[in-house]
Amino acid sequence: MQTVLLSIYLILIFFIILLYRKLHRTKEGKIKIFEARLNHDELLSYAEHLSQNHTLSKKAGNIDHLMRHLDGNYRYINATYKALSTSEVQRSVPAAEWLLDNFYLIEQQYKETKQNINRKFYRELPILDEGNFGGYPRIYAVIVELLSHNDSSADKNILIEFLNSYQSYATLKNAEIWAIPVILEIALIEIIRRQCELIRESMEEFGLAEEILKSPDGVEEALSKYIKEGPSTSLFEHLLMLMKRDNSDYPEVISAIDEKLESINMTAEKMIRAEYLKQTDDNG
């Protein structure tokens, strides 16, 4: 019965996937959310692992918790979009440029999802009792886990295989199968929100880089303080980009950055070259 339902829903899921791909396609391809991508066999094994470790709550299902979470995710994305409109960071972060170009699609998807939710139906969805997704529908956790560990891909064949592997230990209810198209839409908003968190971090580091270059104490002294605190390589990238933009020449800064990057087998020169090659690929 489960296999039949999955087959029936292929058409609906196909259209959701088309929207997903449109949302996640940039000049160089889709947005990559996580580094820890699982291969095909690992992904299916992980589905079985999830199934064995998920514990369902005895409480009645409630979609309100998920809807509040969806609203919060959208507000965060919206705030990031507005902040980017007046920030130069979009020039150095491909995901930021993508968000500016595609926000209208995200907004449209969010509004349609809110309109299409049948709260009475979604109350039938089993809720997880504990863990990161405690209080959320089980099918939502399953879909988010799939996207998180599959390079954010919603390929229909992988989706079906993942769900079938999950059901090796725990059978999904019919209501969960029927809910997949809308749950996918909500999960996509979750994934985009996570990307926005990375964009926000990059914006903060861009601002910090500007502060360092404008420091009244001098660039070298300001940078030395932050180097002791162990800044990320992203801060260095922003510094180099701003120096290039302003045609600034700070050999001491380059030397200090090189010294810090040496421990990870990277140099400022390599970073500049890598950025140049990336921009060349983007424009090609």
Region locations from a protein language model:
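ATP-dependent phospho-/nucleotidyl transfer catalytic cores
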Residues: I31-G134, E210
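Extended charged low-complexity segments that act as oligomerization/scaffolding linkers
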Residues: E190-L198, S202-F206, K214-G230
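Active-site activation/catalytic loop segments of kinase-like enzymes and analogous catalytic loops
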Residues: G135-I177, L184-E201
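Nucleo/cytoplasmic regulatory scaffolds in medium-to-very-large eukaryotic proteins
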Residues: Y20, M67, Y74, E97, ...
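Alpha-helical transmembrane segments
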Residues: L12-K22
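Feature marks short, highly hydrophobic, charge-poor N-terminal signal-anchor/signal peptide-like helices
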Residues: M1-I8
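Juxtamembrane/interface segments at transmembrane-helix termini
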Residues: Y20-K27, R200-E204
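Extended, charge-enriched "interface" segments that sit outside catalytic cores
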Residues: G29-I63, S234-G284
